[in-house]
Amino acid sequence: MSQLLTMSELSKEEISEILKDAEDFANGKERKATEQTFVANLFFENSTRTRFSFEVAEKRLGLEVLNFSADSSSVQKGETLYDTIRTLESIGAKAVVIRHQQDRYFDELKDKVNIPILNAGDGCGNHPTQCLLDLLTIKQEFGRFEGLKIAIVGDIRHSRVARSNAEALTKLGATIYFASPEEWKDETNTFGTYRSLDELIPEVDVMMLLRVQHERHDHYETDIMKEYHENHGLTMEREERMKEGSIIMHPAPVNRDVEIASELVECKRSRIFKQMENGVYVRMAVLKRALPNVLGGMKHELFV
């Protein structure tokens, strides 16, 4: 049963195969379920890109989508997450996509349910499909990971994107640097080295900006965000000093003129909307891996 909970569970070869499948889907290869198959999407946190790209991926694969609303479900009556998943399994769901505010919510489920769990983000912990779409975007741009220098900039402490990407990119041979305000550093994330943003600007191949997660902070004021942009954001002046051929990435949603100058969101270096497009293809590949009996299995030459 091919669940996807964290990037640490994937080998380089497994990452390679997922990316190759995603690239095939991006190039127009089609794959349809061979029988009626239900997949349930459970989002306990707000989401636009992840939720809808999973739904588009499911529908493009010919899967039947069950969209779960916590507000109108028995969760409001005290039903546990485990009982909810077992209920969906009992009525015919063959896989579940879950986003949850609790770090590692899946620990209580993974050895108890009989259908694959696809983690769409757990608290401040992991975001494997975001990581995979970022890897696909980088691979399309540079053709490799080995030897690339990548800066992950912003709220490292609260970012599941930073955690998943730093681990996976290190595994694939890239060098990771972090740039962050002191209070948002995460000393438990040992996959990168902290340096100042202005030192990194002319050196790195990828500038990966992180959203300031105001919902996880006590203070979110205009003057504080203006100060953040000046000290830690990608300003127009900083973009002008970036390395030739380097790219800008952001998992979105973007706080314009906070993490990045509004004018740069769709500039020549930006791959922000390309990342979103790649999210559909990566999630198609992840679903195909999770449901081999109805979506088939393909082996590929290594893509890493």
From Swiss-Prot:
| Gene Ontology terms: cellular component | cytosol
Residues binding L-aspartate: K77, R160, R211
Q: Tell me the enzyme class.
A: transferase
Sites binding carbamoyl phosphate sit at R49, T50, R99, H127, Q130, A252, P253
EC number from the UniProt entry: 2.1.3.2
Q: Which UniProt keywords apply?
A: Pyrimidine biosynthesis, Transferase
Gene3D superfamilies found in the cross-reference section: Aspartate/ornithine carbamoyltransferase
Functional pathway: Pyrimidine metabolism; UMP biosynthesis via de novo pathway; (S)-dihydroorotate from bicarbonate: step 2/3
Q: Name one GO molecular function term.
A: amino acid binding
Q: Which reaction does it catalyse?
A: carbamoyl phosphate + L-aspartate = N-carbamoyl-L-aspartate + phosphate + H(+)
Similarity-based family: Belongs to the aspartate/ornithine carbamoyltransferase superfamily. ATCase family.
**Functional note:** Catalyzes the condensation of carbamoyl phosphate and aspartate to form carbamoyl aspartate and inorganic phosphate, the committed step in the de novo pyrimidine nucleotide biosynthesis pathway.
Describe, as the record does, how this protein assembles with itself and its partners. Heterododecamer (2C3:3R2) of six catalytic PyrB chains organized as two trimers (C3), and six regulatory PyrI chains organized as three dimers (R2).
Q: What is this protein called?
A: Aspartate carbamoyltransferase catalytic subunit
Q: Organism source for this protein?
A: Bacillus cytotoxicus (strain DSM 22905 / CIP 110041 / 391-98 / NVH 391-98)
What is this protein's gene name? pyrB
